[in-house]
């Protein structure tokens, strides 16, 4: 049974990539440029050429997009795996010479003709000088390993270290770490043992976070606590009752969640909505009550399809979370003191993005409501530490049949990390 080998697939891929870059640079004089989405590509090979040779990835992405449009939500890990298997082409044994000829023809169609191909190599390398202290500090910073998540494994640290930009001594474009596999392992282990990193678990594959990310989560917990019992966006009884009458099909527990969200006065509140629990229907009832009380209700979700689904189900204006994150100019924030922002599928929201949204709400006097299902999205457990300050808030747990209202909230990072 070779399945245990796959446990090391991510780390092995990072090491192989680092060694390949090292040898291509030292032996052939290749230089590198940032990839379109992530990683690095050989400088001189355009994104069009890369796309031409990424047909398999494009097929998977197209199939996933079609599935998500059909089901109205993001695909779960199991569904992604099914798509990967379903779109796998049959084996086709083509002679090597024919393959190479085909590759050259495809590259030439996008401008990578023989002369340009030859120009990719032969660059003189002055050798890469790595300031380890600066590298570790940068990797542990806001734009580093925790830029999109809160915790990471050693395998993920290897990937991040291999792909982190290293400033060039001559002032030219930064390059990836060009040290080879063995040195990559040494640097990664030194980073994990550095003052910038905190070990969270002691399992076979430990989890880590950064001191900087703990600071982000401290801000989240502090803002959550400060936002309790603020009398924020309170909705009169008659508007809540009218909304519940219009949504008479709601269960008793769902009705209680509507009341809690509309009448507790917390600036920040969260709920866990299990699959099939009718969370958007519950949100629609809340939106009716808030709107009747004169508040402006907006919606958001991480993925575009989830955003469209939320808008269609609730009738509120919705944008992606990314849209809000690029509208952070203090002079033109999209929220104001009469706004309530509802974030659907909040379990896909990173702590860093949550921190930004909470700061925006606190600055403008808006309120924030989060609802999602960590189990549905395969979310990683949050870094809890001593984040009990947020435990005094309220969280509803929406089950497929009923809504179970918990008397105390888990820490906000626990929902969204």
Task: Give the positions of each predicted feature.
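Conserved ATP-binding/catalytic motifs of P-loop helicase motor domains
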Residues: 1-417
């Amino acid at each position: 049974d070779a399945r245990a080998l796959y446990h090391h697939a991510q780390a092995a891929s990072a090491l192989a990539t680092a060694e390949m870059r090292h040898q291509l640079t030292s032996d052939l004089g290749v230089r590198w440029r940032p990839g379109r989405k992530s990683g690095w590509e050989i400088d001189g090979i355009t994104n069009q050429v890369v796309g031409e040779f990424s047909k398999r990835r494009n097929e998977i992405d197209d199939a996933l997009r079609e599935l998500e449009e059909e089901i109205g939500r993001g695909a779960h890990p199991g569904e992604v795996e099914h798509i990967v298997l379903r779109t796998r082409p049959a084996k086709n044994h083509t002679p090597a010479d024919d393959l190479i000829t085909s590759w050259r023809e495809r590259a030439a169609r996008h401008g990578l003709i023989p002369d340009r191909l030859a120009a990719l190599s032969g660059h003189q390398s002055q050798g890469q000088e790595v300031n380890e202290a600066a590298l570790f500090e940068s990797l542990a910073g806001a734009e580093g390993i925790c830029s999109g998540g809160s915790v990471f494994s050693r395998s993920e640290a290897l990937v991040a270290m291999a792909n982190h930009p290293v400033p060039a001594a001559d002032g030219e474009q930064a390059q990836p770490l060009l040290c080879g596999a063995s040195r990559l392992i040494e640097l990664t282990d030194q980073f994990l043992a550095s003052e910038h990193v905190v070990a969270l678990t002691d399992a076979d594959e430990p989890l880590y976070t950064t001191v900087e990310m703990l600071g982000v989560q401290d801000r989240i917990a502090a803002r959550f606590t400060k936002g309790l019992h603020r009398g924020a966006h309170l909705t009169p009884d008659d508007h809540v009752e009218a909304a519940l009458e219009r949504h008479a099909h709601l269960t008793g527990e769902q009705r209680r969640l509507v009341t809690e969200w509309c009448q507790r006065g917390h600036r920040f509140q969260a709920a866990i909505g299990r699959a099939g629990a009718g969370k958007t229907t519950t949100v629609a009832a809340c939106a009716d009550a808030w709107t009747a009380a004169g508040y402006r209700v907006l919606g958001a979700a991480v993925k575009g399809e989830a955003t469209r689904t939320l808008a269609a189900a609730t009738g509120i204006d919705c944008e992606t979370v990314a849209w809000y994150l690029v509208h952070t100019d203090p002079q033109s924030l999209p929220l104001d003191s009469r706004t309530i922002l509802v974030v659907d599928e909040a379990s896909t929201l990173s702590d860093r993005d949550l921190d930004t949204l909470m700061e925006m709400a606190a600055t403008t006097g808006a309120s924030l409501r989060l609802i999602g299902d960590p189990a549905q999205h395969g979310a990683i457990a949050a870094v809890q530490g001593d984040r009990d300050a947020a435990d005094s808030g309220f969280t509803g747990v929406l089950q497929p049949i009923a809504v179970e209202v918990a008397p105390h909230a888990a820490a906000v990072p626990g929902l969204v990390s």
